[in-house]
Amino acid sequence: MSNSDIRSFFGGGNAQKKPKVSPTPTSPKPKRSLKKKRIVLSDDEDGTIENSKVPASKSKVQKRNESEDISHSLPSIVHEDDKLVGSDGVSTTPDEYFEQQSTRSRSKPRIISNKETTTSKDVVHPVKTENFANDLDTTSDSKPVVHQTRATRKPAQPKAEKSTTSKSKSHTTTATTHTSRSSKSKGLPRFSDEVSQALKNVPLIDVDSMGVMAPGTFYERAATTQTPGSKPVPEGNSDCLSGISFVITGILETLTRQEATDLIKQYGGKVTGAPSVRTDFILLGENAGPRKVETIKQHKIPAINEDGLFYLITHLPASGGTGAAAQAAQQKKEQEEKKILETVARMDDSNKKESQPSQIWTSKYAPTSLKDICGNKGVVQKLQKWLQDYHKNRKSNFNKPGPDGLGLYKAVLLSGPPGIGKTTAAHLVAKLEGYDVLELNASDTRSKRLLDEQLFGVTDSQSLAGYFGTKANPVDMAKSRLVLIMDEIDGMSSGDRGGVGQLNMIIKKSMIPIICICNDRAHPKLRPLDRTTFDLRFRRPDANSMRSRIMSIAYREGLKLSPQAVDQLVQGTQSDMRQIINLLSTYKLSCSEMTPQNSQAVIKNSEKHIVMKPWDICSRYLHGGMFHPSSKSTINDKLELYFNDHEFSYLMVQENYLNTTPDRIRQEPPKMSHLKHLELISSAANSFSDSDLVDSMIHGPQQHWSLMPTHALMSCVRPASFVAGSGSRQIRFTNWLGNNSKTNKLYRMLREIQVHMRLKVSANKLDLRQHYIPILYESLPVKLSTGHSDVVPEIIELMDEYYLNREDFDSITELVLPADAGEKLMKTIPTAAKSAFTRKYNSSSHPIAFFGSSDVLPMKGSAQREVPDVEDAIEAEDEMLEEASDSEAANEEDIDLSKDKFISVPKKPKKRTKAKAEASSSSSTSRRSRKKTA
C-alpha cells in the first residue's frame, strides 16, 4: 500500500492532495541558500549573486561610503512575492521595471528581498492594528510598505543586524506574534485566505470588560449555567481546527470541559493547560480564574465562547486550509503515518509465520522486541541491564552497586497499574538475554510449604531445560540459565499463608535471578521485600507513545482508526494496552471503521469495573466535585460507589467527615461560616445515626438486605452532601475496628469479674463498673504501688474474699479511667513489690467460686462420635449398650487436664540422656567397689 493509500486509510478527508503554490515564471523563487544574498543586476551581464556583507578587508569608512554612493543613485526596490515595489508604492514585474529604467541613466539597481527588509534595522514597519482579525489578513494588498529614501535613510551602522521581531518586541500587538510564527514556514502566511477570513469574522469576547471571579462565588454561580446539551453541536470538515491551539478556562454554558476538549481534538485542534504566546484562542467561560485573565490581557490573546468555537467548526475548511500552520500539522501527521508503516513492516518481518485465525490479538501482536513496548523505555533498559550483569554481580557476591545500584540485588520488583506491559517486558527481556522462564502467578498456590516444594533444587544455577536434556537432545550450556518470575505477588490471599516471607527467604539464598511483579507497591504485605529487591516502577504510557502501535495493529487488521479515536481509547482505558487491543478485536467483528464518537460508546459499554479501595471511595465522596450543581453524577452513580466496599465505605466517611471545609460555607460571611459549619456537621451526624438504625435491621435477626441502598444513602451520600469540599488532611483509616475490638474485650473482662463476685455482691455489670471497680482499683493496684511488703497479704486476702483471681487483678487495672491510667500505674510499681506479690499468690491456695465444664478442653486428636438417625438408633441400641463401657473409658482418656488452669498436673520426669546414664552407672559401680574394699 502506498503512502497516499495509508493517508486515505487513516485520515479520511485528508486523502486529497493539496495543490502547491508555484511561483510565476517571470520571478523564480530564490533558493533557501539565498537568504542573506543580494542579486546585483548590471547592464552587460546577467544577475550575479554577491554576499550582502562587505569583505573584511575593507574598512568601516569605505563600507559606509560605498553604501552612501549606491543609495544616491538607486531607488529602493523591495521584492515582495513576485513583484517589485518601488518607493512610490507601485507594484510592477521585473520586465516592466527594466523597460521603464531603459530611458534613464544606466545605473545598477539592487533588489532587496522581503526577508531582508523585515530583518534589517534600517527598514521600519510600524504595524498597529485595531483588532485581531485585521492582523491575520496577511494577504491584503492594502498593507502599507514603508521604504527609506535618500533623505530619510540613516548611515549604516557597523553593528550586526538584529531582527525587529524578537520576543522583546512581539508583545505590542497580536499580529506581530502570528507574523513571527509564520516566518518559520518558508515565507508562507500562517493561515490561508479562507482561514483568515473565517478568523476575521469569528465573534470575540472583550476580556477587558470581563469581571474577575470573586472569592467564594464559584459554586454559587455554577448553578446559573444552562442545561447541558441545550445547544446543538455542529458538524464541520475533517481536521478543520488543524494548527490552532486553544486553552479552556471557566465554566462553559452547555459543554463540560472534557466535552469541549474532546470536540476540539476531534477536529484536529490542540488543547493546552495554560495560556501563553503560542495560544491562538481562549475558550472562555464564566468565572474564569484571575491569574488566567491577567495572562490573557498581558499577551492579548483573542477569547471566544462556545458560539465562537461552533463558528470556527462550521466555517473553517478541511485540514485547516493551506497555511503554514496547517502544513506543519499535516507534516506531523505524515510523520506519524510513516512511523506506523515502519511498525507494520517490522511486525511483518517478526511474524513471518502465518498466525491462526482463532488466535487472539493480544497473543498475535505480543511484542517481539523492545521497540514494540509502549513507554517505560528507561525502566525496561534497567531491567535488561540487571539481567545482563546478574552472573557477573553474583561472582562479586553482590557487593558492587554499579552506577544505578543494580549490582546489590538478587531480585527486582516491577510495580505499576495492570495492562501496561510489566509481565510482557519481563518475559521479553528474559528471552532476549537467553534465559529460560519459570513463572508462578495468581493461579498457583504459593504458600510457604508449596514454595519450598516447588522451588526445591530450582533456585540453583541450572536451567529448567537441563532437567529434561538427554544424550540424544543435549542442552546448549550457553543457554543453561533460568529466571524465576513471580507474578501478582500482591494478590497472595490468606491461602498463601507465609508466601511473601518465604519468597523473601528464597531471594536471599537464591542463585538465579528472580523478577517479582505486583500492582500495588504500597501494600503492607510487600514490606519484607523492601531491602531485598530493586524497585522498578512502571508508569502509564501516554497517547503519543501508544498511538503508532495501536494504529499499526488496526492497519494490519483492516480497521480504520483515527488518531482522535486512539486518544479517547487511551484516556478511557487509562493506558491499558491489553484492554485496548481486546476492544478493537471485538469491535472489528461488527464494524470496519471507528470514529471518535464510536470510540466513546465502545469505552462506555466496555468500561472495566475496577473495585475501588476504601480510601478512594472516601475521597470521591468528600471531594466537592461529585455534589457540584454542574456535576453529571446521578444518584445511582453515588450509590454504586458505596457498593465497591459496603463494609468499610461508610466507616471511612464517618472517620474523615470532620476534616473537610464544606463548599456550602464558602458563600457565607466569615462570622457566620463557623456556625454554618457546625450546622452541617450536625446534619451529617444525624444522618449517620439514622444509618445505624438501618444497619441494625440489615444485620439483625431478620436480615433485611433489601435495605442496603437505603443504608448507602443515609450513611454515605447524604452526609457527604453536607460536608463535601476541600480536605486539608490525609484520608485516615477507620478507628472503629480497633475501638470495637477493645470494647468487646473490656465487656468480657467485666462479665468475668461480675461472675466471680456474684457470691458476695448483687450488683449488675453497670453498677459493678460504676461503684465497685474504682474502689477495687484503689484497694489493689494503688496499694501495691506503695512498695511496702506488708500490704501484699492484705491485697491477697481481699481478692480471696471476693473470689478474684490473678487475671481479675489485671482486668481491674485495665478497666479504670482514663484508659492509660492503669498502664502508667503498673510502670510505677517497684519490681520487688511485683515479685513479692506474685510469689506470695502462687505459693498459697485460693477459693474458687465455680468454673464451667467448657474450661476443660478435649484433646486435639479426639474425633466426635456421629449421632445416629432415628431408624438407626433402634437397630443399634444393643450395640450401644455393649460399647458404653468402652466409650466411657475413651472419654476419660480424651480429657486433657493440662488445659485446665485450676488443676496442677505434675510434670513427667525428664528422660536422662545416654551420657548421664553412663556417668551415673559408672559412679554407682565405683561406690560399690569402694564399699567392697572397705
Swiss-Prot record:
Q: Which GO terms describe its biological process?
A: cell division; DNA strand elongation involved in mitotic DNA replication; mitotic DNA replication leading strand elongation; UV-damage excision repair
Keyword annotations for this protein, in alphabetical order, are: ATP-binding, Cell cycle, Cell division, DNA replication, DNA-binding, Nucleotide-binding, Nucleus, Phosphoprotein
- Give the species: Schizosaccharomyces pombe (strain 972 / ATCC 24843)
* Domain BRCT, residue spans: 236-326
Protein name as it appears in the record: Replication factor C subunit 1
Q: Where is the composition biased (Polar residues)?
A: 89-104
Q: Which gene encodes it?
A: rfc1
Q: Where is the composition biased (Basic residues)?
A: 29-39
Read off the Pfam families from this record.
AAA (PF00004), AAA_lid_RFC1 (PF25361), BRCT (PF00533), RFC1 (PF08519)
Could you tell me which residues carry Phosphoserine?
27
The record lists ATP as bound by: 362, 374, 416-423, 519
Question: According to the UniProt entry, which residue ranges have a biased composition of type Low complexity?
Answer: 165-186
- Family, per the entry? Belongs to the activator 1 large subunit family.
GO MF terms listed in the record are: ATP binding; ATP hydrolysis activity; chromatin binding; DNA binding; DNA clamp loader activity
Subunit and partners? Heteropentamer of subunits rfc1, rfc2, rfc3, rfc4 and rfc5 that forms a complex (RFC) with PCNA in the presence of ATP. Interacts with cdc24.
Compositional bias, Acidic residues, is annotated for 876-895
> Region Disordered: start and end of each range?
1-190, 876-934
Please name the PROSITE patterns in this protein's record: BRCT
Biological function: The elongation of primed DNA templates by DNA polymerase delta and epsilon requires the action of the accessory proteins PCNA and activator 1. Subunit 1 is essential for cell cycle progression. It may associate with components of the DNA replication machinery and serve to enhance the efficiency of DNA replication.
Question: Gene3D superfamilies, from UniProt?
Answer: 1.10.8.60, 1.20.272.10, BRCT domain, P-loop containing nucleotide triphosphate hydrolases
What InterPro entries does the entry give?
A: AAA+_ATPase (IPR003593), ATPase_AAA_core (IPR003959), BRCT_dom (IPR001357), BRCT_dom_sf (IPR036420), DNA_pol3_clamp-load_cplx_C (IPR008921), DNA_replication_fac_RFC1_C (IPR013725), P-loop_NTPase (IPR027417), RFC1 (IPR012178)
Q: List the signal peptide residues.
A: none
